[in-house]
């Protein structure tokens, strides 16, 4: 697991805001920067892990930002593979990056109430690898539902494709999204490839991050 210093965390935050500024513009960018400001969700953004257990992916302080940046990079690479294969891409780069950057936004929780809090039980840390636990102070929500709720709270609009990309990033790992991927009627199939690319990029990123953890173990 990575052990970031305060300086490292600040650099990661600055890189993320810089990435937003390269992709988005106008009112949308300003609202995103406000949502991620220190007065709003900035603290949660910087400190959040990407998961709660060390054998999942990026379960350390700052892991969330590492993960979403990995997903964004892998999603863009996956899009290029699509194009090289002669498949027509039916979404914009902005839609791709918006969905990638925000597919796990719900893991930030709400302002002042993070989604993950440190696990205090040494037994759970030792025997289950549980470094963080879900914060019971927040209303229970699916991570993607909270992501969309947060975007709505800050007045950040999104396209239908961006919404579907965020909703379906977990692919078949989420029982609630299976009907979107498994359809026996042509007219009910997904009408954009964005969710496929987002899911593959998310899955790849999780595996890469998990492999880094496996390789870092002393035995």
State what each model feature region is.
Residues 71:
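Conserved hydrophobic/aromatic pocket- or pore-lining residues that grip, position, or stack substrates
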Residues 52-61, 66, 78, 89-213:
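Divalent metal-dependent catalytic cores for phosphoryl transfer on phosphate-bearing substrates
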Residues 1-49:
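Non-catalytic interface/linker regions that flank or bridge core catalytic/transmembrane domains
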Residues 75-83:
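Structural motif corresponding to the C-terminal cap of alpha-helices
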């Amino acid at each position: 697991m990575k052990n970031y210093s305060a300086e490292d965390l600040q650099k990661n935050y600055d890189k993320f805001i810089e990435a937003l500024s390269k992709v988005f513009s106008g009112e949308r960018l300003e609202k995103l920067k406000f949502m991620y400001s220190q007065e709003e969700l900035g603290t949660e953004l910087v400190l959040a892990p990407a998961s709660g257990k060390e054998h999942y992916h990026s379960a350390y302080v700052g892991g969330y930002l590492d993960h979403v940046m990995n997903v964004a990079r892998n999603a863009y690479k996956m899009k290029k593979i699509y194009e090289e294969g002669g498949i027509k891409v039916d979404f914009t780069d902005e839609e791709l990056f918006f969905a990638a950057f925000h597919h796990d936004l719900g893991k930030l929780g709400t302002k002042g109430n993070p989604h993950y809090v440190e696990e205090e039980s040494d037994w759970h840390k030792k025997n289950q690898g549980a470094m963080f636990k879900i914060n019971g102070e927040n209303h229970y929500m699916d991570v993607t539902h909270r992501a969309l709720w947060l975007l709505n709270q800050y007045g950040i609009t999104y396209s239908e494709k961006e919404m579907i990309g965020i909703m379906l990033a977990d692919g078949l790992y989420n029982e609630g999204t299976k009907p979107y991927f498994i359809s026996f009627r042509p007219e009910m199939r997904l009408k954009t490839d964005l969710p496929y690319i987002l899911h593959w990029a998310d899955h790849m990123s999780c595996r890469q991050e998990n492999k880094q953890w496996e390789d870092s173990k002393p035995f």
